[in-house]
């Protein structure tokens, strides 16, 4: 029951404040007792605060100790009565040890240094630098010998470009004998007077062995000599490359610069004749091992020389086999090799932008009079080279590719009856120029000859052809088709009114496709050779994606058109023609996963666009592919989601 005027609430608030105050005071007393070490009182909460305070004061007073008086020591001055005068004396500071003056005769060294400065300002003559002071201070036993630490000799080589490149041969080490010093002075005078030529380089290399056995020739001087020697052509083109001790990369840079100097001359020889190119390559490949064998004593290993000899023999063999007509095969052979040094060098040679490397088919169009008599020989050579390249590449890089190949064929034989085939209208090939198709097919390594000999089945100039094309990724083609990572797109497009000629052409092409099964294994080899050329480097092939798709299209077309699936193809063609002629349908972009199709026909639904812009879901009569057709042609439950949210069920 509330009191009048809220007095009850005021009393309660006062009591709460008192309780809080007592609580905090108790905590303060406890903290003080703990700090002073006084025993805590009896744990009785009923004791009033005043009694508790008295108790605490009593305890504190009892524990308080009286401090003892500490006696301070009194200072007794013994000299209290005696007065001592203050002494004034200088401070003695610590001195450095007494230095003994050196007895060295520095007059000769000063005159030599002055002469050096004058001679270096006047002309770039021979310079003799002597670091005598520091060496004589550390080693006084050599104080009489002047030229002890550093005796560089210099000379200038006159080049055809009227440049004077000074070349220093730094030698440092223990001080030589006076006889050797006199001999070195004579050599320096002779070098400054004589105009250096090719004979002078050989004399200096011989004389260096005479007067420097006791010296330790620094590594920089010898490597600088090797760089600027006439054997290396790097002196005129670029600054000398940095040579690390025995690293093969430095030799690669030297070889690359040698090939760059010869790149301009090969562009003039390239268009004339294949024999001149082969002779030029033989000269280049003969010159490089000789250069490296001369300078191989410190930074070229024996393995590099062996590699160069192997490359030379291989290039000779390929040019002799190829009969100078198919340059593309030669480039593929050299680029598929494991030796990356010759790979980079050959790439530097064959950098003519106007020429694309093709095999005998492209040469057949450009030079028909050359390639026709050698057609059989080239076909045998291409076949052997493709087999060798595919087997060696599979053994080296993909050891399990042969097993994949067998599994790939078996799975294709099983899975091809369930896959749908892409069809284009009859006039689709007519719009594409024959030159573009021929340039795309030129990288198929002899595939064009097979197509040319089929009696005009796939002739490039005929325009009334409807191609069957299945676009698969290169990753799917290498795997078995029992599992497909992503669905492949099979695009169906046809016009509403097809003439009867198209039906005849489709049936004729299905019959002709059975003839292509004989060439399946050869196209398998072509497929793997093309894939190997792609993996060996994208520096040869610029339009790699187009070439990939073209190879896969030819390969899959040949594999799919077997005799086992001939009735299936007839059924598909008849069924599609029925949909084309009877229905006013536009078949567009139907997606179907080739890897998960089974023999049972799956019922597929589709979305239909009607004039009121609502999604109509229906079951198509074909039940194999998704298509967009009119509302009257579809049977099944049609659910129209209108804007008002109503559901309409119709049965047509």
Curated annotation (Swiss-Prot):
Record keywords, A-Z: Chromosome, DNA-binding, Meiosis, RNA-binding
Cited InterPro entries: Redic1-like (IPR027883)
Comp. bias intervals (Low complexity): 473-498
Molecular functions per Gene Ontology: DNA binding; RNA binding
GO BP field: meiotic cell cycle
Localisation per UniProt entry: Chromosome
Any one GO CC term of the record: chromosome
Presence of the UniProt keyword DNA-binding in the record: yes
Xref: Pfam families: Redic1-like
DNA-binding region extent: 1-231
Chain intervals with Basic and acidic residues compositional bias: 377-388, 402-417
Stretches for region Disordered: 363-434, 469-506
UniProt biased composition (Polar residues): 389-401
Function: Involved in recombination, probably acting by stabilizing recombination intermediates during meiotic crossover formation. Required for normal germline development and fertility. Required for meiotic progression, complete chromosomal synapsis and crossover formation. Binds double-stranded DNA. However, also binds branched DNA molecules, such as those containing a D-loop or Holliday junction structure. Probably not required for formation of DNA double-strand breaks (DSBs).
Disease: Defects in this gene may cause non-obstructive azoospermia.
Subunit note: Interacts with MSH5. Interacts with TEX11.
Miscellaneous information on this protein: Incomplete or abnormal chromosome synapsis and significantly fewer MLH1 foci observed in spermatocytes from a case of non-obstructive azoospermia.
Name of the protein in question: Regulator of DNA class I crossover intermediates 1
Organism: Homo sapiens (Human)
Native organism taxonomy: Eukaryota, Metazoa, Chordata, Craniata, Vertebrata
